[in-house]
Regions:
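A catalytic-pocket lid/entrance helix-loop region that shapes and gates access to the active site
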Residues: 1-48
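Active-site nucleophile elbow and catalytic-triad environment of alpha/beta-hydrolase enzymes
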Residues: 5, 9, 103-120
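Accessory cap/linker subdomain of secreted extracellular hydrolases
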Residues: 47-85
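Active-site-adjacent alpha-helix of alpha/beta-hydrolase-fold enzymes
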Residues: 68, 141-154
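Hydrophobic, aromatic-rich cap/lid helix
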Residues: 73, 92-113
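Conserved alpha/beta-hydrolase "acid-adjacent" motif
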Residues: 112, 137-143
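Short beta-strand/loop motif that positions the catalytic acidic residue
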Residues: 123-124, 130-132, 136
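Catalytic active-site module of serine/aspartate enzymes centered on a nucleophile-bearing elbow/loop
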Residues: 154-187
Length: 187
């Protein structure tokens, strides 16, 4: 899915009031490492997670990383996929994923506000294909529509029976079709 890296996009996933409203049960698991932290008072999940993920306490680091990865893995597909979460439950994978993502998010993805949208004119003449799941809870489809509106040479494929994960059958099918289409154009 398309992720624009704006504060509201990060907040949708990692702060209360966005995806947490759809997955309240998984959200409770995501919040567990934050009990007795600044996040309880401030509501700043990402900043508090960043402190835990970079802290000296190894047990807290891994607990936070696993909760972060479990949250993301749990909301990535339209229908639950038990084996999708296998990688997410590995402590080292979870720590790498959580630290990288969290580092970007506390630094506003190293973007100026709306930087991607403001610069779409630079690539709007280039062909492209966006494949986005209709029920993507990590990157809501609104972001794909915003990019598509500014990218004249781009096709937008909204997959009706998919969430965020590239392993979902509809996403896989559309990615293969897009790859074949470009292979034919470039041949």
């Amino acid at each position: 899915g398309v992720f624009l890296g704006r504060q509201k996009d990060v907040d949708w996933i990692y702060e209360a009031g966005g995806a947490s409203r759809m997955f309240a049960d998984y959200w409770q698991v995501f919040q567990k490492p934050l009990i007795n932290t600044d996040a309880e008072a401030t509501g700043e999940m990402v900043n508090t997670y960043h402190k835990l993920l970079c802290g000296a306490d190894e047990l807290k680091r891994f607990a936070a990383a696993k909760a972060w990865a479990a949250w993301e893995g749990s909301i990535a597909t339209l229908n639950p996929r038990p084996h999708l979460g296998d990688d997410f439950s590995d402590g080292h994978f979870a720590l790498a994923l959580a630290r990288i993502e969290c580092h970007y998010f506390v630094n506003q993805c190293f973007f100026e506000p709306n930087q991607l949208l403001k610069n779409m004119h630079k690539i709007s003449h280039l062909p492209g294909i966006i494949v986005h799941g209709r029920y993507d809870m990590i990157c809501p489809a609104e972001q794909a529509f915003e990019v598509h509106a500014l990218w004249q040479a781009c096709q937008l494929h909204i997959v009706r029976d998919a969430g965020h994960a590239q392993q979902e059958p509809g996403i896989v099918d559309n990615l293969i079709k897009a790859t074949r289409e470009f292979a034919i154009k470039l041949a």
